Amino acid sequence: MAGNSIGQHFRVTTFGESHGIALGCIVDGCPPGLTISEADLQVDLDRRRPGTSRYTTQRREPDEVKILSGVFEGKTTGTSIGLLIENTDQRSKDYSDIKDKFRPGHADYTYHQKYGVRDYRGGGRSSARETAMRVAAGAIAKKYLQQEFGIEVRAYLSQMGEVAIDKVDWNEIENNDFFCPDVDKVAAFDELIRELKKEGDSIGAKIQVVATGVPVGLGEPVFDRLDADIAHALMSINAVKGVEIGDGFDVVRQKGSQHRDPLTPQGFRSNHSGGILGGISSGQDIVANIALKPTSSITVPGETIDVNGEPTELITKGRHDPCVGIRAVPIAEAMLAIVLMDHLLRHRGQNQGVVTTTPKI
């Protein structure tokens, strides 16, 4: 199975399934000398892990990460960093009724047709459980970016169903279970989730992820443009069906005189581009939005077929999120951090000595 790695200079490879023994990843390319510990990684893992909120799945996994290699006496050695998280709360019996059926809206049918075999327990490799390792690897990238370059990567839930935020207060995000920056919308999110649970249904969501302090010059045109790699990374997150950079699809309604970001000696007057011009970071904030579909793991009966192609009906059992967008916030942060880390190392390797007479704004 290909497609388990991302990045060139900072490369992350994950392995494991939802109901397997453990999840793991190998992080290659992290520079030596970075002070890092399991506790550093655990902070973001605790933000993502299941069973911590009444609004998400009640599968209770501690998600305690173990650093197996690449760190000695609290500092990275420059060699491969091995990370492992054991699965401890699998309930595979919840999926025995669907082992010969394809859950509509999931990867069951496509995995079966591609590989000829599938792990039906919780979706196997296609489960969002895999993203725990992305978050662990992303925590390494986030710490390096912050410590060495002053770059900060943060995200928040901006919309759930028809409920959208009206304001952004970064200080509010960690004060509620929704990662919501608008305290006035928390009650509406709560009411929506309660109603969905009664109905046995789910809802989609939108997340904004922002990186501040990114220097000008990151990105490798033409095929490894920074925005292309960011879109690739964010699109790889489970349930993501759309990615926007900057104003995204709103540019369709804009005129050139409105969309362009005027330059002044003091800096840019606007940031419609989302901090990227020509595939290269402009020095402004990197801004991206992702849209996540509503999960199909719901108790509302749905049509499907079995492995013999016969029609049947399916009701999903198990423990699932009524809105997968809530726990996707730290995942989005991790993926953006991994891309920025990779491009910083690539840029430093080729362009570190580049000097221009034009001042940076």
UniProtKB/Swiss-Prot annotation:
Listed name of the protein: Chorismate synthase
Gene Ontology annotations of biological process type: amino acid biosynthetic process; aromatic amino acid family biosynthetic process; chorismate biosynthetic process
PROSITE patterns associated with the record: CHORISMATE_SYNTHASE_1 (PS00787), CHORISMATE_SYNTHASE_2 (PS00788), CHORISMATE_SYNTHASE_3 (PS00789)
Quaternary state and interactors: Homotetramer.
Homology family: Belongs to the chorismate synthase family.
GO molecular function, one term: chorismate synthase activity
Residues engaged in binding FMN: 125-127, 238-239, 278, 293-297, 319
Enzyme Commission numbers on file: 4.2.3.5
Keyword Flavoprotein attributed: yes
Pathway in which the depicted protein is active: Metabolic intermediate biosynthesis; chorismate biosynthesis; chorismate from D-erythrose 4-phosphate and phosphoenolpyruvate: step 7/7
GO cellular component, one term: cytosol
Species per Swiss-Prot/TrEMBL record: Vibrio cholerae serotype O1 (strain ATCC 39315 / El Tor Inaba N16961)
Cofactor binding, note field: Reduced FMN (FMNH(2)).
Biological role stated in the UniProt entry: This reaction introduces a second double bond into the aromatic ring system.
Annotated binding of NADP(+), by residue: 48, 54
HAMAP family assigned: Chorismate_synth
Cross-referenced Gene3D superfamilies: Chorismate synthase AroC (3.60.150.10)
Keyword line: Amino-acid biosynthesis, Aromatic amino acid biosynthesis, FAD, Flavoprotein, FMN, Lyase, NADP
Catalytic reactions on record: 5-O-(1-carboxyvinyl)-3-phosphoshikimate = chorismate + phosphate
Required cofactor names: FMNH2
The organism's taxonomic lineage, starting at the top: Bacteria, Pseudomonadati, Pseudomonadota, Gammaproteobacteria, Vibrionales
Top enzyme category: lyase
